């Protein structure tokens, strides 16, 4: 089970972009990877197509393993681990392990 969701703000813990923050654009559950905005950028060579769209070198985000990111906790100013808690009304929510604060309910 992945505890990271789309639109979460995360911090990169390991790799060439260690320390960078960004928003999760997409969660790839089957690979346990996430696409993070402006993190792990790669260059791809694109051919021009028949409709006149120009080719060239395009920079885009590559997936990063979920174990290399942590959700950003504004209260502590860094990455934090996540747990789950059931509220009185029976709703299951994500909470930060360090301070027990509820993470953005939907």
From Swiss-Prot:
Pfam families: KOW (PF00467), ribosomal_L24 (PF17136). One of its GO terms (molecular function) is rRNA binding. PROSITE patterns: RIBOSOMAL_L24. The lineage of its organism: Bacteria, Pseudomonadati, Pseudomonadota, Acidithiobacillia, Acidithiobacillales. Part of the 50S ribosomal subunit. The keyword Ribonucleoprotein applies. Belongs to the universal ribosomal protein uL24 family. The keyword Nucleotide-binding does not apply. This is Large ribosomal subunit protein uL24. One of its GO terms (biological process) is translation. One of two assembly initiator proteins, it binds directly to the 5'-end of the 23S rRNA, where it nucleates assembly of the 50S subunit. One of the proteins that surrounds the polypeptide exit tunnel on the outside of the subunit.
